[in-house]
Amino acid sequence: MATPPPGVSGGGVSGGLFEADAPRPLADRLRPKDLTEVYGQDHLIGPQGSLRRMLDNKRLTSMILWGGPGCGKTTLARLIAEGSGLVFEPLSAVFSGVADLRKVFDRALSRRQGGQGTLLFVDEIHRFNRAQQDGFLPVVEDGTIILIGATTENPSFELNAALLSRCQVFILNRLDEATMREMLL
């Protein structure tokens, strides 16, 4: 049996990125820790980017992040929550329903009454039907939550107009070869 290279499980080096018993998935361990580590989205988080200005001015609004798989929607939402001091509540529209939303809304309302804000991140938000999407309206309008919805589908076709009118839509770039090369070097 061949010996794995150093840094790989069984290679004698603990803490390697590819270690079999590592506590978190590789993608999670490599996830950017702050906005300076995010690649390919300078139009949003660069010095003149819309999201950068929102964060710098502490004027965060509800938004929809639209982009292909792997472009950084979830990572960006986590970093926005950390940078804004809001409690991050992640949900997947694939695995969640109205009951899950109500629980999050109740926790967010309790936090709000205590002076703490909540950022609700909904992955695959386009998977919620129109009635479920309407459930966000009162809590977005009254400031109970800041909503960040992530979608790979065109929000103009997949999200209802009432929700879209209360959110800014940001388009995330696909990571091209040059960007991926830059990330590796």
Annotate each predicted stretch with a short phrase:
Residues 2-6, 10-19, 53-91, 106-109, ...:
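Walker A/P-loop
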